[in-house]
Amino acid sequence: DMHVREEYEDMGKEALKVGLRIQELMGLNPDTEPVIDNMWANVSQFGAHNRNHTHPGSHFSFVYYLQSPEKCGSIWFSDPRAQAIAVQLPYNPKNPRKRETLNEVYWAPVPGRLIMFPSWAVHEVEPNLSELKGKKGLRVSVSGNLSFHLKKGVKYKEEREGHDAKGFLTMKGAEKRT
């Protein structure tokens, strides 16, 4: 319930600002707004890591780093398109490749950095190998999921018999079809 607690409101607002920017850049429906579905803390001691995973049920996910000692492990994203690596393009070895052409992208944890990504993106967090002892060696972050919901008072489609306000067929509508 971190996303509804007052002490985490500023962090939530930062994530919502990024969500609004994504909405603008991607040309999403202006009748929707970003909503934080949930938020949780990650306190990772030496050796702690997160295996590759996704966040089903949300549009975007985020991580906000609060503490990240040296060698505490990066977050990395892999290209979900299995065939993308079947035939590699001949990139110029004398020039660094652009980030968007890589099959894997790593982001170092930096305190104050918020990373937002599509919830379907496969990602993993490397083990915390910080040599600092005690609380100073912990990797501390807050993660969450964000979805776009219709703004209050906006109907997705005109309601019609057997359908809800979002235009989905209801049980009443299904009964009439049989």
What positions do the PLM features span?
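Catalytic core of non-heme Fe(II) oxygenases with the double-stranded beta-helix
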Residues: A41-M116, E126, G137-L138, H149-R160
